[in-house]
């Protein structure tokens, strides 16, 4: 009874689906109200003027205008604002 021992099966071969995070609209770009500006985990970017923050920390435009990124304040926070189009 010539046997061949069963080969071991690999326990690898899994990976999570990418979440497509990151900046979606860049500085100087024109956006409409409701457009998503940044998808993030936690507040890497903070909401500034005319920008809202969703419950998953997604930043979105509250009105039409141009995107502006700033760094400043006492904690050197990165903020995203919307400058109204004149």
From Swiss-Prot:
Name listed for the protein in its UniProt record: Large ribosomal subunit protein bL27
Record's keyword annotation contains Ribonucleoprotein: yes
Signal peptide: none
Record region (Disordered): 1-21
Highest rank taxon of the organism: Bacteria
SUPFAM superfamilies reported for this sequence: Ribosomal L27 protein-like
Family named by the database record: Belongs to the bacterial ribosomal protein bL27 family.
This protein's encoding gene: rpmA
Keywords assigned: Ribonucleoprotein, Ribosomal protein
GO biological process, one term: translation
Molecular function via GO: structural constituent of ribosome
Annotated PANTHER family: LARGE RIBOSOMAL SUBUNIT PROTEIN BL27M, RIBOSOMAL PROTEIN L27
Cellular component terms (Gene Ontology): cytosolic large ribosomal subunit
């Amino acid at each position: 009874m010539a046997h061949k021992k069963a080969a071991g099966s690999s326990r690898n071969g899994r990976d999570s689906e990418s979440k497509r995070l990151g900046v979606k609209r860049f500085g100087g770009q024109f956006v409409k109200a409701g457009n998503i500006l940044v998808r993030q985990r936690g507040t890497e970017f903070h909401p500034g003027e005319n920008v809202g923050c969703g419950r998953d920390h997604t930043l979105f435009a509250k009105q039409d205008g141009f995107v502006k990124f700033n760094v400043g304040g006492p904690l050197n926070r990165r903020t995203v604002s919307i400058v109204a189009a004149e």
